[in-house]
Amino acid sequence: MKVLAIKLVDYREWTERLGYDREWLIQKIQNKFMMKIHEIASQYSTFPLQLRFDNFLMIVDGITNTQLIYMINDMQENLPVGIKTCLGYGKTPLEAQWNASVCLNNKEDKFKEYVDEKIAALHFDINFNTEALKYTSVYDSFLEITNIYVDLSRFLYKIGGILQYLGGDNYLGFVSTNSVNKVIEKFSDDNKIKVGIGIGQNARTAIKLATTSLEKIRNNREKTWHIEEEYH
């Protein structure tokens, strides 16, 4: 699988130049440029996992190196600092992002040609969480969401996957297609979490299919997982 690692260069120095009354401004600018990056990424059929904001990842199977270069140039035009990128390859998203991350510390960031793989996206949703908000505090609900995020992250890490919190009670994960059965086995009898699985040629399609799967689960309350796959 192919993962693009993106690092904002001299990001800390940029934030420090904003003065002491800066946290609100940092959040404003971060959200503004991430909104633009999401828009650009969607045009190239990928999706940014924003993670730390100053470092983020993209699953880029199904995208040519030429398209990646155009996308990176488009992103650079909308960021307040320079960026460094590196393309990593691995049997799993976890391995690919590790190789891409190591590459970020090297002087050269040339893109090698790698084989594209199908992408498996996972859209997790917590059952009854919205209803539970009536009986707990906003902060306690957030703590529960955070604990589940940690548990899901650890599980996916063990099978070579990566995870991003989407907001609310939703999470987005990526695994290799070889690990999908492990996900199904884990959540087939789980009455707390449902997972929509999508398999596609690129990240955007895989995520769309994962969300489609999740909606089908919601319409059939007896199921805890469903899978949709793109065929060519």
Swiss-Prot record:
One of its GO terms (biological process) is biosynthetic process. This is GTP cyclohydrolase III. Its EC number is 3.5.4.29. The keyword GTP-binding applies. The keyword Coiled coil does not apply. One of its GO terms (molecular function) is GTP binding. It is an enzyme of class 3 (hydrolase). Catalyzes the formation of 2-amino-5-formylamino-6-ribofuranosylamino-4(3H)-pyrimidinone ribonucleotide monophosphate and inorganic phosphate from GTP. Also has an independent pyrophosphate phosphohydrolase activity. It catalyses: GTP + 3 H2O = 2-amino-5-formylamino-6-(5-phospho-D-ribosylamino)pyrimidin-4(3H)-one + 2 phosphate + 2 H(+). It holds the Pfam family GCH_III. It comes from Saccharolobus islandicus (strain L.S.2.15 / Lassen #1) (Sulfolobus islandicus).
